Amino acid sequence: MKKFIIAEICVLLALAGGFWLGRVTGNNTSYEHYYDNADKAWTAVKQLDAPPVGLDSPDKSRLREVRAAYREVFENYPDSLWADDAIYQLASRISRTDEEAFALFRRLINNYPDSEWADDSMYAIAFASYQIAEELKKTGTLESLDAYYDRALALFNQLIATYPGSELSEQAQFNTAMCYYGKDELNNALAQFDILRVPFSDSPLLYQILYVTGEIYLKKQEYENARIEFTNVVDSGDPDLAPLASFGIPQSYLAEGKYQEALEGYQKVIDLYPDTKAGQDAYFYMGWAYERLEKYDEAIAQLEKGIELFPRNENAANAQVYIAQIALVNKDIAAAIDAFQKVADNATYDYDTRRMAQYWVGKIYEDNSETDLAVAAYQKLLVEFPEPHKEATHASNNVNENYIQTLRSTGL
């Protein structure tokens, strides 16, 4: 019996000894060098990322290697000094509107709330949400629009409350007002901007506040208040905002129906800021102000001047269409067709505008019983603009081979 007891004791001692030896010589070695290995991994990834590879880098293979290396740091060494840095650096190499980037930023905020990158991460998610909402608004997609603005609002407010000393706090306060503006909650936006005026009196954001306030008053049709705000920005001499604010003044007159004052204001923009986009736009808006005054010759001359000087301006296509429409109203058929054809043939203009113009060439010929020319114009529409107009009910979408065949037969 004793032999069995002694044997059992020996087995237990052997197991205990083996367990202890394993702790000393096994996995414990990796923990013993945990922080050294973390330092080495961080040094290696920084060397790999020198010079820093950006999201738009053409070397996608290197970008993938750098991303993988940063992930290895925070996945393998989550308690190291470098884990939060690695998460932030990886998230920064992914599109800010990508859900993977959101997940990484949230991970940093939740796991490392005291990190120097925590406020940046919160701001990144908030601003990306705001940008998504703005893009949805541009495309006319209203679904989820308020949800993105609301998410941005909540995160901007959380950043302000959680990190009051952050360098991003001021920008976050400004952006809360911009979220209200984006949601068309104009009174809330105005109230927020009014709150910021005094504390931001020495901030670089002050003139942005004044400019957007002017835009809000313009939307609210409070034209005199809009001009006051725009004038304050112009007087500041801000190189970026002063031209825009100067353009906003005649815009308010145009909206108010004071077309002569608008003309004078646009001319002032051209004189003061000829090399800015506002200066370019003023040429076109002068043409539209002349049209409102029923000075059609002056309107056409001004619009043609704008097109000649700035053929790639975003207003050029609409100006050319405007010229065609004025000619059509004046029953100058040849001029109208020529103007519409110029739009249709200009590859720098957007597809739908060109398709619409080509349709009108055919339509004018058809309405004037010039069947052969109408057929040729419509065939050109089908060949050069095979995709339908984005507006499902647009008249150009009704033109097809059957339409042309019917036109041929009825025109004989």
Q: What is each model feature region?
A:
Residues 1-412:
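Acidic, polar-rich low-complexity tracts and alpha-helical solenoid repeat scaffolds
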